[in-house]
C-alpha cells in the first residue's frame, strides 16, 4: 500500500515540477535566462532550445547576454527571439546578443497573473486526476479482496492528505509568482 502513496506522491511531484517550469517562462521585470527557455532555433534542420546552443547570463537587473556557440546561427537566433511573443529585441554587439528586458506595464502584469492562474488550475486538475487514479487502484484492491474496507478508507484518506499538501504547494508557488509579477 506504500506503493500507492509513493505513486501518488511521485506523480503529483511531477505536476508541481511542470508547473514551476511553466511559471519560469513567464517574464517579470527582472532579467532571467529561464524566460528564453521556450525559444527554439532552426539548427541543422532541427528545432533546438536556445539555451543548448548558447551561454545565457544575466548581465544586470534588466539585461541578458547571449553568447552563441556557433556564430553562424546569429540570424536564426535573432529571428526566433523577435518572433517569440516575449516582446524582446535582441541587439548584436561584438560576438554576443544583448537583450534589454523592458519594464512590464500594469496591463501586461495583469495578463501574466491571469496566465499564471490558468497554469495553476491546470496543475490542480493534473493533481486531482492522479488522486482519482490512486483511488481507483485502492477500490480495485478492495474488490480483489487484497485490502479490507477499513484499510480502503484509511488509504483514501491518506491519498487525500497527499493531494491537499500538493494543492497547497501549487497555491504557495502561485502566490510567490503573483507577488514577483506585481513588483
UniProtKB/Swiss-Prot annotation:
The entry's localization annotation reads: Cytoplasm
GO BP annotations listed: cytoplasmic translational termination
Q: Which UniProt keywords apply?
A: Cytoplasm, Protein biosynthesis
Which SUPFAM superfamilies does the record cross-reference, listed alphabetically? Answer: Ribosome recycling factor, RRF
Q: Does the keyword Electron transport apply?
A: no
Note the InterPro entries from the entry.
Ribosome_recyc_fac, Ribosome_recyc_fac_dom, RRF_sf
Looking up Pfam families in the UniProt record yields: RRF (PF01765)
Q: Write down any Gene Ontology CC term.
A: cytosol
Disulfide linkages recorded for this protein, renumbered to the chain, are: none
Q: Name one GO molecular function term.
A: ribosomal large subunit binding
**Key word Protein biosynthesis present:** yes
Main location per the UniProt record: cytoplasm
Which family is this sequence assigned to? Belongs to the RRF family.
What is its biological role? Answer: Responsible for the release of ribosomes from messenger RNA at the termination of protein biosynthesis. May increase the efficiency of translation by recycling ribosomes from one round of translation to another.
- Protein name stated in the entry: Ribosome-recycling factor
Please report the organism this UniProt entry assigns to the protein: Buchnera aphidicola subsp. Baizongia pistaciae (strain Bp)
